[in-house]
Amino acid sequence: MCIRDSFYDEVLAVLGMSSMYEDEVCIGYAHEGNPDVEFYITQPANGEPVTFGNGTQISFLTKTKEQVEKFHQIALGLGATNEGNPGFRPSDSNAYYAYIRDPDGNKICAYAYQ
C-alpha cells in the first residue's frame, strides 16, 4: 500500500493500537483485542494530493501520562516536530497533554487524565 509507513505503526503501538485493516486506499488502526477500527489513514477520494487541515487536530486518549511521554518521544524520534512538550494543561488540572506534528504536518495530541 502506497500510504503505509512505519511512523503510525510505531507511534500508535505506544497507545496499544496496531493496524487491523488495510486495502489499496486506506489503513485502519484499532486497540489490541478490539476489532473496531478507531483511526484511518486514507488516500483522498478526489485524487488530489494529501494535505493537512488548518485548525484540525487528532487526539488520542491514553491510560497514563507515561504513555503520553513515550508517544511524544517516539514521534519526535521518527521525524515529527514538537508542538507542545508533555505537561499538565492548564498547569493546575489533571489533564496531561503532548502535541506533535507528524511528518506530513498533521497536528496530533496524546493525553491522559491523572
Question: Which stretches of residues belong to each language-model region?
Answer:
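Short, solvent-exposed beta-strand edge segments and adjacent coil->beta transition regions
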Residues: 53-57
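A broad, low-specificity signal for short, low-complexity segments enriched in glycine/proline
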Residues: 16-23, 59-61, 71-72
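Vicinal oxygen chelate
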Residues: 60-104
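Short, well-ordered turn and helix-capping elements at secondary-structure junctions
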Residues: 43-45, 86-90, 114
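Conserved small/polar residues in nucleotide/adenosyl-binding loops
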Residues: 1-6
